[in-house]
Amino acid sequence: MRSDIKSYTLSGMGCSASALAIDMAQNLLKIHRNSHAIVLSTEILSNGFYSGNDRSKLLLNCLFRTGSAAILLSNTKEAKEYSKYKLLRTLRTQRAFEDKAYHSAFREEDSEGKLGFTLKRDLLQVAGETLKSNITVLGSSMLPLSEKVWHGVSIFWKKIY
């Protein structure tokens, strides 16, 4: 590989590594002018495939598969003219500081000693709360001031009545 090419590997994080990689590429493009960044993301289930009988671990085999995606990010003048999309901002939220969220999905051995990924029933609630906090942060950064004021007034009235 040429000396002017940098390569980074984020592994063991599943599809969540894609958001990290795009955020990292965006930050690198802020530093390096007239550059390109390619983000290649793959998710390979074979590493986490579970062959045991524990139902809480079998669900992962049904939900996730092998897949991939790629995106080219650029900050060149030509890219501004010809690109179809523009990355305005990236946003990541996490809830691992809450015990319920932290323990909703984890890797452990079953009673037979087979390694599997356990998904708890709390996962859907945690995912909903994470999505809500993500939309809250995104809305506050994108909505115009008039909409923010209207939202504040509506919350105020709901608390009073």
PLM regions with names:
Residues 42-161:
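Hydrophobic pocket-lining "lid/loop/helix" segments that shape and contact the acyl-thioester
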